[in-house]
Amino acid sequence: MAEITAALVKELRERTGQGMMECKKALVAAGGDIEKAIDDMRASGAIKAAKKAGNIAAEGSIAVRVEGGRGVIIEVNSQTDFLALQDDFKAFVKESIDEAFEKNLTEAAPLIASRESAREALVAKCGENVNIRRLTAVSGETVGAYLHGHRIGVLVVLKGGNDELAKHVAMHVAASNPAVVSPDQVSEELVAKEKEIFLQLNAEKIAGKPENIVENMVKGRIAKFLAEASLVEQAFIMDPEVKVGDLVKKAGAEVVSFVRYEVGEGIEKAETDFAAEVAAQVAASKQ
């Protein structure tokens, strides 16, 4: 068996990114053969990645890329926000968004498959579950993007206008989180639900009032709801005296669509019982 030197351990550590003790153990198990040690570590890394796959990943990063009338946005999840700020994770996210854009992908599945080996390697190195969650691609006359830190990303498609206007609208979407572009896109189901909520919350106030008065109150609330939910009806964050729709119209443009991603939205996060977790770790250490 070849001698396990400090230089050999260092080389393996540099090539795999694993800890010193893990590298030394791998070299001993491989009889000092560094290439075999790397293969063995990759295999165990895949096993580790499979084990980590059951852990909830609700943190992470949003990435966007826009060029030549095309835009792509992706969400990549991690278990902690700490990992999302690390260089290895950032590199994985950048490589993923670049591949998605350059291959002109329109859904996440092909990207997930293509990036699986890189994902497994990252999981093995960082010890956290990592997932590419979703991807949306858009195209149009004018496509703008805005990234707020690493947690909120927006793509906006305009008919007409320019890049600056599209970016400003994207910034507004990031801050105001509209549900739809215009009031006519709000579903009847959502309107009915809002009406029901209004009647429940104001049951005492409307009790005994004439039906036509109640109906007018409901209409007023629904009109306000539609304005709040619709991008073009919202007051522009950079100039509240102007509606977004009027701002865009004045520039001879029209909002076609938008996509807004926020890290972890819709993912149910696990409630961590730290006392139980510590107790479990102590019990495991005694075995």
Swiss-Prot record:
SUPFAM superfamilies referenced in this protein's UniProt entry, alphabetically: Elongation factor Ts (EF-Ts), dimerisation domain, UBA-like
Localization of this protein: Cytoplasm
CDD domains cross-referenced by the UniProt entry: UBA_EF-Ts (cd14275)
Keywords per UniProt: Cytoplasm, Elongation factor, Protein biosynthesis
Superkingdom: Bacteria
Main location per the UniProt record: cytoplasm
Keyword check for Cell membrane: no
GO cellular component terms listed in the entry, alphabetical order: cytoplasm
A GO term for molecular function: translation elongation factor activity
Any coiled-coil regions, as ranges: none
Job of this protein: Associates with the EF-Tu.GDP complex and induces the exchange of GDP to GTP. It remains bound to the aminoacyl-tRNA.EF-Tu.GTP complex up to the GTP hydrolysis stage on the ribosome.
Classification via HAMAP family: EF_Ts
Record-linked NCBIfam families: tsf
Homology family: Belongs to the EF-Ts family.
Name assigned to this protein: Elongation factor Ts
Species annotation: Ectopseudomonas mendocina (strain ymp)
Gene designation: tsf
